[in-house]
UniProtKB/Swiss-Prot annotation:
The gene is gpsA. NADPH binds at S15, W16, R36, K110, A143, R258, V282, E284. One of its GO terms (biological process) is glycerophospholipid biosynthetic process. It is an enzyme of class 1 (oxidoreductase). The active site is at K194. InterPro entries: 6-PGluconate_DH-like_C_sf, 6PGD_dom2, G3P_DH_NAD-dep, G3P_DH_NAD-dep_C, G3P_DH_NAD-dep_N, NAD(P)-bd_dom_sf. One of its GO terms (cellular component) is cytosol. One of its GO terms (molecular function) is glycerol-3-phosphate dehydrogenase [NAD(P)+] activity. HAMAP family: NAD_Glyc3P_dehydrog (MF_00394). It comes from Xanthomonas oryzae pv. oryzae (strain KACC10331 / KXO85). Pathway: Membrane lipid metabolism; glycerophospholipid metabolism. This is Glycerol-3-phosphate dehydrogenase [NAD(P)+]. Keywords: Cytoplasm, Lipid biosynthesis, Lipid metabolism, NAD, NADP, Nucleotide-binding, Oxidoreductase, Phospholipid biosynthesis, Phospholipid metabolism.
Length: 341
């Protein structure tokens, strides 16, 4: 853990934003958590509990919460954005004119920009300019487990090695390991695709197709990640690490995953709207399936599992029909010879 105790601003008071803010505060960093909901923010600041997203879990007394964005980012050494992907662009635009002189900006948002399919680091770079260090925080991590202090490993990929290391150092601690890398494309691709593939495994489990089917979907889903990664210039080892395989396994098997729970509900015959209403939080896969397939079509890559998820989410096919189509596909070599070259 770093000895530095510079102020850190965390933007976004959902479950993951709150968990990371609590982690940083416990590691001795003056941490301010910003949120839009005045009542929720006031409760966090007074009672040190996020009763909406992390009920019953005590937050550090030193953690402050505010709805004043300018006050949150003032004098911050760096800023951590933790909002849903659909709010990412707007949030970066809001903080851009308020930043102190060139602090780094990191984010734990996963996915692409909805509607354009752009990588989030491309969005941030366009808005913030060329001189601001950027980093993405990703990996297999449920907010509840992090807040409870259970062992977790994540990775921080950035375009500035010093900044990525500073973010990792601030997060690293006795039960939280933070690695570093410089493949932002691969790290963001893994974070986007795992949400879509988690729906597929959830559907299979909801239909009671067995553990063999779950393992097959996870493995072939990883294959889809690797093939798209190769096409867009990401490094395969990134997808074989925490940002890819690690996050994929967790999201496909852990019932704390909203995307897996969505798949479970669909596999049991619930409608999409009813399933989302029951989950009660943002489910990234609904928009990400479109953006993943946008990337795949742009690069001429076939992603049968991801495409089946997209079709099910749009109501174009039933889960049963999607399964039948996947099982009827022409067999091919498991991996193209060029995948790892």
């Amino acid at each position: 853990m770093s000895d530095s105790t510079h102020k850190i601003a965390v933007i976004g008071a959902g479950s993951w934003g709150t968990a990371l803010a609590a982690l940083l505060a416990r590691h001795g960093h003056p941490t301010v958590l910003w949120g839009r909901d005045a009542a929720m923010v006031d409760t966090i600041d007074r009672t040190h509990e996020n009763a909406r997203y992390l009920p019953g879990i005590a937050l550090p007394d030193s953690l402050r919460a505010t709805t004043d964005l300018q006050a949150a980012v003032a004098d911050a050494a760096w800023i951590l954005v933790v909002v849903p992907s659909h709010a990412f662009t707007e949030t970066i635009r809001l903080i851009a004119p308020l930043r102190p002189a060139c602090p780094g900006v990191a984010w734990a948002t996963k996915g692409f920009e909805p509607g354009s399919g752009r990588f989030l680091h491309e969005v941030a770079r366009d808005i913030l300019g060329p001189s601001v260090p950027l980093a993405v925080v990703t990996g297999p991590s449920f907010a509840k487990e992090v807040t409870l202090g259970l062992p977790t490993a994540i990775t921080v990929h950035g375009d500035d090695a010093t900044f990525a290391q500073a973010v990792a150092d601030a997060m690293h601690g006795p039960t939280f390991r933070a690695y570093t890398g410089d493949d932002m494309v691969g790290a963001e691709l893994g974070g986007a695709m795992k949400n879509v593939l988690a729906v597929a495994t959830g559907v299979a489990d909801g239909m009671q197709l067995g553990l063999n089917a779950r393992a097959g979907l996870i493995t072939r889903g990883l294959n889809e990640m690797l093939r798209l990664a190769a096409a867009i210039g990401a490094r395969p080892e990134t997808l074989m690490g925490l940002a890819g395989l690690g996050d994929l396994v967790l999201t496909c098997t852990g019932d704390l995953s909203r995307n897996r729970r969505l798949g479970l509900a669909l596999g049991r015959g619930q409608s999409l709207n009813d399933a989302i209403r029951q989950i009660g939080q943002v489910v990234e896969s609904v928009q990400m399936a479109d953006e993943v397939m946008r990337q795949a079509e742009h690069h001429g890559i076939e992603l049968p599992i991801s495409n089946a998820v997209r079709a099910v989410l749009h109501g174009e096919i039933t889960p049963e029909a999607g399964l039948k189509e996947l099982l009827a596909r022409e067999r091919k070599p498991e991996y193209p010879q060029t995948l790892f070259t």
